[in-house]
Amino acid sequence: MTIIVTGAAGFIGSNIVKALNQRGITDIVAVDNLSKGEKFKNLAECEIAHYLDKHEFIRQVREHILPYQNIEAVFHQGACSDTMNHDGLYMMDNNYQYTLDLLDWCQDERIPFLYASSAAVYGKGEIFREERELEKPLNVYGYSKFLFDQVLRRRMKEGLTAQVVGFRYFNVYGQHEQHKGRMASVAFHHFHQYREHGYVNLFGSNDGYGNGEQTRDFVSVEDVAKVNLYFFDHPELSGIYNLGTGRSQQFNELAAATVNACRAAEGKPEMSLKELVEEELIRYIPFPDALKGKYQSFTQADITKLREAGYTEEFFDVKSGVERYVKWMLENLA
């Protein structure tokens, strides 16, 4: 049985491939666009059966000429995840139409389809639950994800021929994101800031939040891969699910966890947030005017639906997850 993973050389896709490998599954077709060649490194430690360029894959899907038999599932992680990309034509073709074509093909062939949605569909809301009235995206990226989720809702009412699951990823961090540049996680950037400068920067006060007190639901990519595989194991489950920890933690906590993990590797003692700020190991910069009115100061996944689907594993909190990530970066990137 063959499994297809799109975006396989990317951040979440490569972690799904790795998680499948850990189960002994290697009959994997990795689909991606390697025009940014450094992404190949994410697949170099994985075992796959074949690589297919994204554009060729899309052509074969649209013409119904994919040569693979007995496809067990499609994990669709390939998308433009740059929330600052305002090219609506590109975003809608790459994130919406491509996903719609894949859905139609998977439904025709009765293949389970697990795809990446996003918490960006909620915009600046303060309640993050999988309900239409709570969804108000702020940018074309969020809209592209929102629009496809509406397609799934309609298809579910009409009746599905095979499993379809959309995961609304919250703030994901972890190994294999180094190719993402400015779109990499805050933990990634803090690690490199600290290694280069000996301190990290955080946004100052804004929107009623104090220095570094804006909060996010930070979720480890290890947990994201686990949840994807849980639904792969349960093809009877379909729907849209938030994928976060259910906890909202301050950027201050993330910065402190990153700096302290780096300090621990240097043989230095852990410091409190107050001490880190006093010693200027954490510094605050003015909140950018360009982000005012477009910035989520708070996110927290409501994971009630995920728990009701039977997923009982505990998620890493920021401290434990970031410690694991910093250890990986020190071993692989430093």
From Swiss-Prot:
The organism of origin for this protein: Neisseria meningitidis serogroup C (strain 053442)
Pfam families named among the record's database cross-references? Epimerase
How it assembles, according to the record, is: Homopentamer.
The alphabetized list of GO BP terms reads:
ADP-L-glycero-beta-D-manno-heptose biosynthetic process; carbohydrate metabolic process
Record text about domains = Contains a large N-terminal NADP-binding domain, and a smaller C-terminal substrate-binding domain.
Catalysed reaction, written as an equation? ADP-D-glycero-beta-D-manno-heptose = ADP-L-glycero-beta-D-manno-heptose
Q: Which domain of life is it from?
A: Bacteria
Identification of the protein by name: ADP-L-glycero-D-manno-heptose-6-epimerase
- The catalytic activity of this protein is classed by the Enzyme Commission as 5.1.3.20
**Listed transmembrane segments:** none
CC cofactor note = Binds 1 NADP(+) per subunit.
Active-site residues (renumbered): Y141, K180
